[in-house]
């Protein structure tokens, strides 16, 4: 009886997963990306350079969490083994053309990420310790007046990012270290738990500081390896680019044909850069923006989507396509295909490098995923006791994931993430007019040659903002008195 019930549950989860990630989410997120790209006048292309400037400028020391620290934290969550194994799977399933569609969806997703991160900044709050918190749950409550909607979103995010995805990352780390060096999985798990506990028990600020140290190292190291493969195979680059375009448009036979390439590439891109999911918006709200305007964080997170997909995922694609592993059947897929490609190009030592990369990618994802979930726990309850228990449960899932494969839990997390995205897209579409007006205000100030700052009194249609952040207390009191009279 129990076995039949579990089989039915697993079947239902797999069906829902296929429905969400095979069609519904692809259409919804692509439509949202197109809508926001058009309404913002292709801002991701027009002001791309300005966005890069803000990421670099975000390194300046300020009170609280800097824009660069937030950028690194969101990148820590975005960039994981999916940027390696996931790209390999997309190419295996959809052929080289999947890369083209992955690039296209990232460019559209940059506009969606801009909208959600701007809204997260507009409706952020300050907790009892003076730390900014925000994200979809907060703009659903304050912007739409729908706390119930924010509650649903928070629960879905906590399940996916707080528990399940962290067990996935821990499992990947222990497998990598066990395979490369033969280390005992239980010992590895305990080390991961202790290292994670040290960071997450320090709260958002410690997570941000750790991400600021880890992310640049892991990104530069991985890009250096990809660049080495690129340089040694530079003569093959034109042919590889031609194959990507031809396969995407159906001019070349591919594993799954033109449609297979499209679906595989779009799904991989969406899952990797998380644009529209509402995940990165949680940490975007924690920044003390520079310039002091909500839209500045929109620019920063827009660049995050670009780096994740156009830079990191493309590096994995280059390693695989230029190595020649696709030309001969080898039975490898996922991370195994990438490992084979590196071995062919760089030799056996690359196994150790890949293990090192996986450790950095996965550990940084664990602490960043936790930071997303923490803000949603604090949305549901302000209790420090509940937060303490939550941290214990996160660490327990990390330990369990280190020693056991939890495929059912992980598949359920994909469902949670998919539902989370649908809830978030509905919210940002309903709040899009607010985002458009705030972003337009930023652009007008930028064009006039002044450093953009946000004056909420110019936006009487935006209410329910927290006093002391974008509205000072005197202005808020005066506004309330005027409305009463």
Model-flagged regions — what are they?
Residues 28-35, 39-52, 171-177, 183-233, ...:
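Membrane-interface loop-to-helix entry segments
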Residues 115-124, 225-243, 256, 285-291, ...:
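Extracellular/periplasmic helix-exit of transmembrane alpha-helices
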Residues 42-67, 89-91, 95-99, 111-144, ...:
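Flexible loop linkers connecting adjacent transmembrane helices
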Residues 32-37, 108-130, 136-200, 356-366:
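Helix-loop-helix module between adjacent transmembrane segments
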Residues 25, 40-44, 82-87, 162-174, ...:
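Transmembrane helix-loop junctions in multi-pass membrane proteins
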Residues 17-50, 92-130, 307-315, 351, ...:
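Extracellular loop-to-transmembrane helix junctions
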Residues 61-93, 119-137, 141, 258-306:
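Alpha-helical membrane segments and immediately flanking helix-loop junctions
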Residues 1-81, 91-98, 399, 429-457, ...:
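N-terminal alpha-helical transmembrane segments of multi-pass membrane transport
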């Amino acid at each position: 009886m129990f076995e039949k019930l579990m089989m039915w549950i697993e079947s239902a989860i797999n069906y829902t997963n296929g429905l969400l990630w095979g069609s519904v989410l692809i259409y919804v997120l692509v439509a949202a990306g197109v809508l926001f790209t058009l309404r913002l006048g292709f801002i991701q292309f027009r002001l791309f350079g300005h966005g890069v400037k803000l990421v670099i400028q975000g390194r300046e020391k300020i009170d609280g969490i800097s824009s660069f620290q937030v950028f690194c934290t969101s990148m820590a969550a975005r960039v994981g083994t999916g940027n390696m194994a996931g790209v390999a799977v997309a190419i295996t399933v959809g052929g080289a053309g999947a890369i083209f569609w992955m690039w296209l969806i990232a460019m559209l997703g940059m506009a969606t990420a801009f909208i959600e991160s701007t809204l997260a900044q507009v409706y952020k709050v300050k907790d009892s310790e003076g730390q900014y918190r925000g994200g979809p749950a907060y703009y659903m409550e304050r912007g739409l007046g729908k706390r119930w909607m924010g509650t649903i979103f928070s629960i879905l995010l906590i399940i996916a990012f707080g528990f399940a995805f962290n067990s996935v990352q821990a499992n990947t780390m222990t497998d990598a270290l066990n395979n490369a060096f033969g280390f005992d999985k239980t010992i590895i798990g305990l080390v991961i738990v202790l290292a994670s506990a040290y960071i997450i028990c320090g709260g958002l600020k410690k997570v941000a500081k750790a991400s600021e140290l880890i992310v640049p190292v892991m990104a530069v190291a991985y890009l250096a390896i990809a660049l080495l493969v690129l340089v040694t195979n530079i003569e093959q680059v034109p042919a590889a680019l031609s194959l990507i375009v031809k396969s995407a448009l159906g001019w070349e036979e591919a594993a799954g044909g033109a449609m297979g390439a499209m679906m595989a590439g779009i799904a991989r891109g969406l899952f990797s850069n998380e644009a529209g999911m509402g995940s990165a918006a949680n940490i975007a709200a924690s920044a003390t923006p520079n310039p002091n305007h909500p839209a500045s964080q929109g620019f920063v997170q827009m660049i995050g989507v670009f780096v994740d997909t156009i830079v990191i995922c493309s590096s994995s694609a280059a390693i695989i396509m230029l190595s020649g592993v696709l030309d001969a059947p080898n039975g490898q897929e996922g991370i195994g295909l990438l490992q084979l490609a590196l071995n062919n190009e760089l030799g056996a030592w690359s196994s150790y490098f890949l293990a090192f990369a996986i450790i950095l990618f996965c550990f940084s994802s664990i602490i960043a995923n936790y930071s997303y979930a923490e803000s949603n726990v604090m949305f549901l309850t302000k209790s420090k006791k509940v937060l303490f228990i939550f941290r214990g449960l996160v660490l327990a899932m990390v330990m369990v994931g280190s020693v056991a494969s939890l495929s059912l839990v992980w598949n359920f997390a994909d469902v949670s993430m998919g539902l989370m995205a649908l809830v978030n897209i509905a919210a940002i579409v309903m709040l899009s007019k607010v985002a458009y007006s705030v972003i337009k205000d930023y652009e007008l100030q930028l064009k006039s040659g002044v450093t953009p700052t946000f004056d909420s009194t110019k936006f009487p249609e935006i209410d329910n903002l927290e006093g002391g952040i974008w509205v000072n207390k005197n202005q808020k009191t005066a506004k309330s008195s005027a409305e009463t009279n």
